[in-house]
Amino acid sequence: MSANKGSAPHQHGVKGVYHGGEWLDMEDCDGVFSNIEEKCSGCKNEGKCPPRSRSRPSANSDGTNYDIVVIGAGCIGAAISRELAKYKLSVLMLEASDDVSQGATKGNSGIVHAGYDDKPGTNHAKFCWTGNQMFPDLDKDLNFGYQKNGSLVLATNKDEVGILEDLLKRGETNGVQNLRIVEKKELFEMEPHINPNVIAALYAPDAGNVIPYEFAIALAENAVDNGVELRIRREVTGITRKDDGLELTVNHWEPKAYILSKEVSPLQKIGTTQLIILGFLASLTLWAGALMNLVPAGAFPKLMGTILAFLVLVKVLFPGKSKVERNTPISELVNQAGAIEGSGGTKVSVDDMKVGGSGCRTIQNGETVETETVKAKFVINCAGSYSDKIANMIGDKSFCIKPRLGDYLLLNRNQGHLTTKTLFPCPDPILGKGVLVQTTLWGNLILGPTARDVYKPEAANMTAAEVQHYILSKCKNLVPSFDPKETIHAFCGARAKSDRGDWIIENSAVDGRMIHVAGIDSPGLAGSPAIALEVVRLLEESGCKLTANPTFNPRRAPIITPKDGMRGLKMGSVGKNDSDGLDEAKMSQNVICKCEKVTELEVVRALRRSLPIDSTQAIRKRTRAGMGHCQGDPANYNCEARVKAIIARETGMPMSQIGGRPWPATSTLSQRWPEESELKDLESRMNE
């Protein structure tokens, strides 16, 4: 059951889980976590592992012609793709970045809003509450973790109480249920740590929260498991209208470091068979020379030995780009991991954020390796902040996306007890909902976001110090007692705000075979499952034949299992507890990330799923390895290097081909592991 009034919130994965919106203690989790994965014995399952930069091809397509192409693999694209997997259709999902959920989905609050704030009659209002009500059942099927914790809009004076009353009426108009205004006495029983000046609040018990990228990953996995094809690192550069559909030109890019690692020198091209032939020919030459007395008899053995030694040396000094062997010790691979980025690096720009942020082509120093042609009967344009550019490719200029930046600060789990509900100030008529204070599913306290329109220089050009001051000072008005020195991470997302002021969910007026799902800003995550149903309806109206897929399986196994402290787990130096990738009992005990207690088995489980993974960042989003207090500090437990080594062992990729966690990405912190002086600066900015 859910947390009691005034009690500290549960932490997902710690002695239990949130499942379908409610809390389950560990002893009640057996039905959720038992038999969660087909037993895998290493290379016996290797044929099921997805190739690089794509899932396994769709059985319903020839690789070029598809019924539907979905552009964008955030929570909207993933939700739509999963819904389409319920039908006998060939579906291709294209993502410009190096993983699913790398755009706005990665950089937001993860709130499943109730829908009381949305203007009646808009798409926001139409789909938010409907989507909200779909989350409990979705989580029961997909196990991404959903907490129905409720939200509170706080009022500090009578004028603001009037705003609460207006919000209550608006919510009821939108069909939102169970809303009520809570007076001060009951409010402080619910939330004893809020600002003592608060006198009332609007309570929405049906609001909840998820980890947004874990939600999108679950949707995408289940879609691919049911036949949808995914290709990552695919930038759509052109769309041509044809009589029989739409033809897309797609650039497949890869990081330059990966391309260089695949290059083979002439000496590396010499294989073992070729060396044997060379050795045989050299021996014949020497033997012939000896017969003709051109080679002294006593020198023959020495010359033969020299030739053989040379051939062996060539193979040792210039090995081919072979796969990493499964029996390579993890300790040996960790030593090859290289330095972990924690300072310097390239800052992510707004243009980068439109196409995947830290996972985009520019930040990854990518180069086109292939240009693909894809044909589709219908195209779903859910490319986030890039969706207006996709529309322009067919001559549709009916909307424009102007990204709005939202900055956040993430605090340690030891601050998570300060609230159980999601806390908002009274909304500003211009700035909207305002900053929030919330305890995440995993127990961290999250503060933010800002609302910086990129077309306003004074907002877009705010310094890191100004952004931090804005967040901390505003959040202090909600919960005065949090400690900013417990900040462990900072990030920013770009909301795809359209010039129409509402979500755009419609057939293109230029060509009805393209359906726009654009400008999906807040509360888009809450509305995503309902939006997916609407897209299916539009497709059917447009002539897309929908026949139920009799083999559709709605279930997806979780990756992370709940833990009771260190019970049954083992920590140690690299190599002490590492397995060979075959002993699942040993892997389930071996802790790879100390702060988050991520096990080797959880990393392996993520790698053996249907989505392509070739970076520690992708594993981080699926298992939380590197997301804890130390943020992957190599001086602590070196978890990022350990994860990189496991990726190499499981996939066979050389360490040089495995991506890491980029820095600084969108952080307002000066380095990944902030020094005491920077944390003290945060404290002073809170009190300025």
Predicted feature residues:
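Glycine-rich FAD pyrophosphate-binding loop
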Residues: 85-106
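Helical element adjacent to the flavin cofactor pocket in flavoenzyme catalytic cores
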Residues: 203-261, 322-338, 352, 359, ...
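Dinucleotide-binding Rossmann-like beta1-alpha1 core, especially the glycine-rich loop
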Residues: 110-190, 199, 434-435
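C-terminal catalytic lobe of FAD-dependent flavoproteins
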Residues: 432, 441-442, 453, 458-591, ...
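Flavin-dependent oxidoreductases
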Residues: 79, 239-255, 266, 360-448, ...
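Cysteine-cluster motifs in flexible loop/terminal segments that predominantly coordinate metals
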Residues: 29-52, 637
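Short hydrophobic core segments
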Residues: 69-71, 261, 374-384, 532
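Beta1/beta-strand and adjacent pyrophosphate-binding region of the FAD-binding site
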Residues: 60-76
